[in-house]
Amino acid sequence: MLTLLSPAKKLLSISKHYSKKTSNPLLLDKALELVKIMKLKSAEQIADLMDLSRQLAELNYERYQNFDLKNNPMNHSYPALFLFQGDVYQGLNANSWKDEEIEYAQSHLGILSGLYGFLRPLDRIQPYRLEMGVKLENPAGKNLYAFWSKIVTNILNQILAEQSNPVLINLASTEYFKVVDEKKLSYPLVTINFYEQKNSELKMIGILAKKARGMMAKYIMQNRIDSIEQIKEFSESGYLFNKEISSPNSLNFIRIH
């Protein structure tokens, strides 16, 4: 099984070099094509492109100006699993993982990325911001979906082909998963959703769903889950699988308040 997550906007402030084993992003050459486009943007253009405040636009302008095109491991880079710090990654809590769990995740967990396309947990990346939904003109078209769709779908098929149970588990957001061409996927796809129930009303609440996705990914990696039936047994933080509102391709979990 291969589990997919979205990245995060909030990043770790890198204060020291990561000294353990890391890997190079699989699609680094393509990512650098986008970096070269972003290096030509002014802070004002970055603000317009991503609807950012002046302060955030300046930060990301500096990030792209300082981006090392040679991807030198000593040059402000860090493993994706630890660099991302948003709600999903709070649920994932990777700092609590054992080395063997991280090693297992390296071939069973993927992170979709607007800049890097697809990342493995230990892939060394530089701080950046570039959401998948951004309308950045590039040689392939008017947005990042045009740039990444075929490439990312192909890499997913390649990785799934190496799995003992080749099923794609989608824990990514709609914005990011749209980059995957489902018609070109060669293997089954299962999407997992999390809902809150209060007074018989079901709601998906963004921040809570994000944390739950991270918790589910952690559960799958730490327990080396390799079947849908095992996924259904997830019960952290009060979430329980609901058979009535689920289907073979959509597993839905509910937490009752």
From Swiss-Prot:
- Tell me the domain of life: Bacteria
A Gene Ontology cellular component where this protein is annotated is: cytosol
Show the NCBIfam families listed in the entry. PRK02101.1-3
The protein's organism comes out as Legionella pneumophila (strain Lens)
This protein is called what?
UPF0246 protein lpl1317
Tell me its family. Belongs to the UPF0246 family.
Per the UniProt entry, the signal peptide is none
Extract the InterPro entries matched here.
YaaA
| GO terms for biological process, alphabetical | response to hydroperoxide
Q: Entry's PANTHER family?
A: PEROXIDE STRESS RESISTANCE PROTEIN YAAA, PEROXIDE STRESS RESPONSE PROTEIN YAAA
Classification via Pfam families: H2O2_YaaD
